[in-house]
């Protein structure tokens, strides 16, 4: 006899009871619309859909995680259209919902909690603890600033690490995630193409010309397209990652149509990365492909890969071929140390070094870059753009924080490489 029951076990319900429940539901819906108005009626009408979602995610928590993945992909776009909605709270609620689903699952069937007791969880917890302690940073002048940043910079990292290990427990879920991710990538590139060929919509124009996005997205070298991401830097970096993941995945899919589809997605992502005008995004494919080549341990692949990477570098760094094309010209500027925008970044970092000299633990979470003007409008650090993620982490958490952050990333890279090279036996999952 099974010790644990199953929420997927079919249940026989008399048709009379089903009919009575449906009739009662319709009656409640009509009452809500007629007596309490449109909003009440709409609220009642979504209850069946909510119950269906609850049932489906209880049966398979991985679906709930994929839902969180999709919502997180689009949440940045929604902030551009509805400024007053608490979108951070939406992500908080969805993360809480995923933990609730796992907790309910544990009441019915055993959960392998030990899956979450990995080194990745430990380093994520260390980073979260450091960021929590930033609340007592003497340089910080606003608890609200700390609270606004600690969730995205620390809490989400830790919670997603734990949830992923507890829910994405089978190889098929990785395939599902790749499929969903590929569709999201195509949508993102499609939106960027709409911006390029048809122009920006009213909300995007407001962000560009009223809220100040123009200064960094309509520049001397052309327009930097950002799709529905928060800015072109995030869009370009995301597309660079998508390009690497899907091009490598295409090599090891047995289905020819799937290979072709993934290559097309990778090509679309490459185009999206280029039209974003984000020079730093070019580092993603260079580093990603280099890491893959080094781990492959295949002499032919190493030789071909090294040749292609060097050829691409020489093409962009030492030639002027295709210089008349704005996309190639902008990509080539990533290797030009005399580029005006690069010089501006260096100047900003020089100013930041002077201000950060006596702040080993940083200025406090939420106190770096333009967003800091909300909490410390007159602070010197609030007037200088951070320009990149790593500079922002350095400014907000100090040299101690940035060294810890980089150390954690290097650990994740090294541990992941070790597992892929020496532990995985599935060639399709391993990638070589």
What positions do the PLM features span?
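Alpha-helical transmembrane segments of multi-pass inner-membrane proteins
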Residues: 2-6, 14-15, 24-25, 49-52, ...
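Hydrophobic transmembrane alpha-helices and their immediate junctions
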Residues: 256-259, 290-293, 397-432
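Transmembrane signal-anchor hairpin modules in multi-pass inner-membrane enzymes, especially those
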Residues: 1-133, 172-175, 179, 254-260, ...
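Transmembrane-embedded, aromatic-rich helix segments that form part
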Residues: 162, 238, 279-291, 303-306, ...
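Long extracytoplasmic/lumenal interhelical loops at the membrane interface
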Residues: 219, 323-397, 418-423
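A membrane-periplasm/extracellular boundary helix in multi-pass inner-membrane enzymes
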Residues: 35, 190, 195-200, 270-271, ...
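Aromatic-anchored transmembrane helix interface
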Residues: 90-97, 119-129, 143-166, 179-180, ...
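A conserved mid-to-late transmembrane alpha helix and its immediate loop/hinge
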Residues: 227, 231-233, 270, 360, ...
